[in-house]
Amino acid sequence: MAELRLPPNSVVKKGKEHKAKGDVSNLRKIKIYRYDPDLDENPTIDSFEIDLSKTGPMVLDALIKIKNEIDSTVTFRRSCREGICGSCAMNIDGTNTLACIKPIEEISGDIKIYPLPHMKVVKDLVPDMSHFYAQYESIEPWLKTDSPAPSNAERLQSIKDREKLDGLYECILCACCSTSCPSYWWNGDKYLGPAILLQAYRWIADSRDDHTGERLEALEDPFKLYRCHTIMNCTKTCPKGLNPAKAISEIKGLIAERHGV
């Protein structure tokens, strides 16, 4: 009989408990995944009790309060606090989202916070985005043209052509969608994932780009594109309300047209 063995230090253990101090009018417990790869120790779940009446309304506000007032070693990324930069992407209450726009009041019970799933962890809630960014670079996410740039002018397009980019250019590369996708979990080394494919379609759909055929050929691969099985987790979890699954479908349709299907 085959014996199943977990990787070393993969079992998550109970960590420290930080009790609230003083008078508390609105107590909530926040459970945070803690892991430092420089230490030869298992990850833990640390618990923090905070008074929500003394913090802001978003999960990120609670994290900042914990870091500033309780445990300065808690590590996470954040920047804009407006849902624009994508830095604070993490798994909150079982769903990938942005901590800065996730209201605490929408979560019942203890607030459980983990890093984005199926990515290596740099520390605590900080995932290693290196592979994700390398995949983004591979699609050449810039305007590719054969004609010289106009002098003292922009490359113009019609209002109708510009509208084709709506729902695409707004992607902030937070990776919430890709890390919610089982196909990306299983084949992340080869499958580009919903975020990168949506970005690829953004340039394919741009009327100013002259290399549509080249871009489609680069994606016509059993793994890069066709590992998408329309599970739809990507569309469900996108904090910007975008539809990566639709973009992937559009790419597949354009490739089929090229083959006369």
Swiss-Prot record:
Source organism per UniProt: Rickettsia bellii (strain RML369-C)
The keyword ATP-binding belongs to this UniProt entry's keyword annotation: no
Record-linked PROSITE patterns: 2FE2S_FER_1, 2FE2S_FER_2, 4FE4S_FER_1, 4FE4S_FER_2
UniProt-recorded name of the protein: Succinate dehydrogenase iron-sulfur subunit
Binding residues for [4Fe-4S] cluster: 171, 174, 177, 238
A GO biological-process term: tricarboxylic acid cycle
Named cofactor requirement(s): [2Fe-2S] cluster; [3Fe-4S] cluster; [4Fe-4S] cluster
Disulfide-bond pairs as recorded: none
Pathway the protein acts in: Carbohydrate metabolism; tricarboxylic acid cycle; fumarate from succinate (bacterial route): step 1/1
EC identifiers of the protein: 1.3.5.1
Family: Belongs to the succinate dehydrogenase/fumarate reductase iron-sulfur protein family.
Subunit and interaction comment: Part of an enzyme complex containing four subunits: a flavoprotein, an iron-sulfur, cytochrome b-556, and a hydrophobic anchor protein.
Catalysed reactions listed for this entry: a quinone + succinate = fumarate + a quinol
Keyword Zinc-finger on entry: no
Taxonomy, superkingdom: Bacteria
Textual note on the cofactor: Binds 1 [2Fe-2S] cluster.
Residues that, per the record, bind [2Fe-2S] cluster: 80, 85, 100
Keyword list, A-Z: 2Fe-2S, 3Fe-4S, 4Fe-4S, Electron transport, Iron, Iron-sulfur, Metal-binding, Oxidoreductase, Transport, Tricarboxylic acid cycle
Domain 4Fe-4S ferredoxin-type: 161-191
Binding site for [3Fe-4S] cluster: 181, 228, 234
InterPro entries (alphabetical): 2Fe-2S_ferredoxin-like_sf, 2Fe-2S_ferredoxin-type, 2Fe2S_fd_BS, 4Fe4S_Fe-S-bd, 4Fe4S_Fe_S_CS, Beta-grasp_dom_sf, Helical_ferredxn, SDH/FRD_Iron-Sulfur
Any one GO molecular-function label of the UniProt entry: electron transfer activity
Binding locations of a ubiquinone: 186
Pfam families the record matches: Fer2_3, Fer4_17
PANTHER family cross-referenced by the UniProt entry: SUCCINATE DEHYDROGENASE [UBIQUINONE] IRON-SULFUR SUBUNIT, MITOCHONDRIAL, SUCCINATE DEHYDROGENASE IRON-SULFUR PROTEIN
2Fe-2S ferredoxin-type domain sequence ranges: 28-119
